[in-house]
């Protein structure tokens, strides 16, 4: 197990300050979400959770090492309210879950210096806490504190279905990367539901959450279509097989609530686990710890794996830090005799 944290990547000294048009002058303190694009560009979502107004913003950095310095972003835009969650839609679309109760779709212009609004729909009655794009890329699912889950047609900008299968606010939804009609949801009603929108009764309960500990985060295994992981408010991470609806593995990873789970794109994927205990843990397929970082000084809110460097994992948190971690992808060598360099 590796516990030391490498220093953050240092941006090059020679870089020109050039705030793009329409970008806000200042980024909000709390960083809520981060997503790499396939070319390595980094998208950030920020929120201000103090003061009289809960503002938010979106930022694109072609050079991730420059984040979160506003003057080195490629594009930025102010949002009406805080950004609770976001995800890429293709290479230029950005789907946002807003504190205002709206689901928003933004798009980069051709030069990628402007982020323009495509739609902003107030279909939820409370904060939209989570969004996920279905594998087809044309539909998405949103979950809210209003207890509702909604399936969207992004091209038509309409809600296709609205469900109230949970009895408390929805904390996470996760679209299957393998099947375009399947997704997961979890809620403060202590239930995890498996959805298939092709069925007359689309939701079925996965009876694997621990009594008394609410599930908070979900992630599908990138290669095994019937397997997913979830984290709970107690800091435990569990691996579930939907065929047996039982926990295959479970591990007490954190001392506080799990805030996010993100699989790597490796051939043998690693799992990044984030928590309100301000730590990041990287786990192997048996949920054993490979790497841990406590570089953040507040809640760690999101993580994203670089598509260009499989060792690079980037995290963001409420301390306004963007931390770049180098995670060992090969087993560490056994300690040998010390060598002397002349």
Swiss-Prot record:
Keywords: Cytoplasm, Nucleus, Phosphoprotein, Repeat, WD repeat. Its main location: nucleus. The modification Phosphothreonine is found at residue 5. WD repeats lie at residues 22-75, 78-116, 123-162, 165-205, 209-250, 253-293, 295-330. The keyword Cytoplasm applies. The keyword Cell cycle does not apply. SMART domains: WD40. One of its GO terms (cellular component) is methylosome. GO terms for molecular function: methyl-CpG binding. It is found in: Nucleus; Cytoplasm. InterPro entries: Methylosome_Comp_WDR77, WD40/YVTN_repeat-like_dom_sf, WD40_repeat_CS, WD40_repeat_dom_sf, WD40_rpt. It comes from the Eukaryota. GO terms for biological process: oocyte axis specification. Pfam families: WD40. Non-catalytic component of the methylosome complex, composed of PRMT5, WDR77 and CLNS1A, which modifies specific arginines to dimethylarginines in several spliceosomal Sm proteins and histones. This modification targets Sm proteins to the survival of motor neurons (SMN) complex for assembly into small nuclear ribonucleoprotein core particles. Might play a role in transcription regulation. Component of the methylosome complex composed of PRMT5, WDR77 and CLNS1A. Found in a complex composed of PRMT5, WDR77 and RIOK1. RIOK1 and CLNS1A bound directly to PRMT5 at the same binding site, in a mutually exclusive manner, which allows the recruitment of distinct methylation substrates, such as nucleolin/NCL and Sm proteins, respectively. Found in a complex with the component of the methylosome, PRMT5, CLNS1A, WDR77, PRMT1 and ERH. Directly interacts with PRMT5, as well as with several Sm proteins, including SNRPB and SNRPD2 and, more weakly, SNRPD3 and SNRPE. This is Methylosome protein WDR77. The gene is WDR77.
């Amino acid at each position: 197990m590796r516990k030391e944290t490498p220093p953050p990547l240092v941006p090059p000294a020679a870089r020109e300050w050039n705030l793009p048009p329409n970008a806000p002058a200042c980024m909000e303190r709390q960083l809520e979400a981060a997503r790499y694009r396939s070319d390595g560009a980094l998208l950030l979502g920020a929120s201000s959770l103090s003061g009289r107004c809960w503002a938010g913003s979106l930022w694109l950095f072609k050079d991730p090492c420059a984040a979160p310095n506003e003057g080195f972003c490629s594009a930025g835009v102010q949002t009406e309210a805080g950004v609770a969650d976001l995800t890429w839609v293709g290479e230029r679309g950005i789907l946002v879950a807003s504190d205002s109760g709206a689901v928003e779709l933004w798009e980069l212009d051709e030069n990628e210096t402007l982020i323009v609004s495509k739609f902003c729909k107030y279909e939820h009655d409370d904060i939209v806490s989570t969004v996920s794009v279905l594998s087809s890329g044309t539909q998405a699912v949103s979950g809210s504190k209003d207890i509702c889950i909604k399936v969207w047609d992004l091209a038509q900008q309409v809600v296709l279905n609205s469900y109230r299968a949970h009895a408390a606010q929805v904390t996470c939804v996760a679209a299957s990367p393998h099947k375009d009609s399947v997704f997961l949801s979890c809620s403060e009603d202590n239930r995890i539901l498996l959805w298939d929108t092709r069925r007359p009764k689309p939701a079925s309960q996965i009876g694997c959450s621990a009594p008394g500990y609410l599930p908070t985060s979900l992630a599908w295994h990138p290669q095994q279509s019937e397997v997913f992981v979830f984290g709970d408010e107690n800091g435990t991470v569990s691996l579930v097989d939907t065929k047996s609806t039982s926990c295959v593995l479970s591990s007490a990873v954190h001392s506080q609530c799990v805030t996010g789970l993100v699989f790597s794109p490796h051939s043998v994927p690693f799992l990044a686990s984030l928590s309100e205990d301000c730590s990041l843990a990287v786990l192997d397929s048996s949920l054993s710890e490979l790497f841990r970082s406590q570089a953040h000084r507040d809640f760690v809110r999101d993580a994203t794996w670089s598509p260009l460097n499989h060792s690079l994992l980037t995290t963001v948190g409420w301390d306004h830090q963007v931390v770049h971690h180098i995670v060992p992808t090969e087993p560490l060598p056994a300690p040998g005799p010390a060598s002397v360099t002349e």
